[in-house]
Amino acid sequence: MFEKIGKNTSMLRTDERVCGTIYLIEEGGKRLIIDSGDGDAEIGFAPDICILTHGHFDHTSGVEENWPCVLLHPAEAAFKGPCLKIPKNAAPNPMKPLIFGSHLLEFFHTPGHTLGSICILDRKTGILFSGDTAFAGGGYGRTDLGGNEKEMEESLGLISKINYKLLCPGHGDIEKREE
């Protein structure tokens, strides 16, 4: 069951140890999800757009073949590494701002956890969907499953400069940014 975290934004969590959080933005009868989980969660619909923050199985295994638009950073689709599961219907994310209803989504390439990790900023709500790059409490994603420690440090530096209000990571708690 999705839990509201904003006017048009909800999240679905299952077993966070093995399944990434699924985020949903709904507007005008359209649905966009960020990450699809590990396939155990029943979302009950085919989203109009699915954006994957990276290619690890706990964020991609929920993608179904009939989903019309699945986007993944181009570097991720080309990389073959541990724990990656790239859906067959994933297309390269052009990494250009995406307008979804009244939401403007901006993409940031944040390698470190994986080569093609991204964060997504919803300019309307101030929500930063950080995948497994940054977590509440200052935590960050592991770099031993196809990542790179130096790139992670650079990505965390980039995130610290992004003007967001709410951090929504791929696992664990969401966190309001202190002003």
Provide a role label for each language-model segment.
Residues 31, 115-179:
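Metallo-beta-lactamase
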Residues 1-43, 119-136:
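Conserved beta-strand hairpin/beta-sheet module of binuclear metal-dependent hydrolase folds
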Residues 28-30, 43-49, 64-69, 123-126, ...:
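Short glycine/proline-enriched coil/turn segments at helix->beta-strand junctions
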Residues 15, 37-100:
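Active-site HxH/HxHxD metal-binding segment of metal-dependent hydrolases
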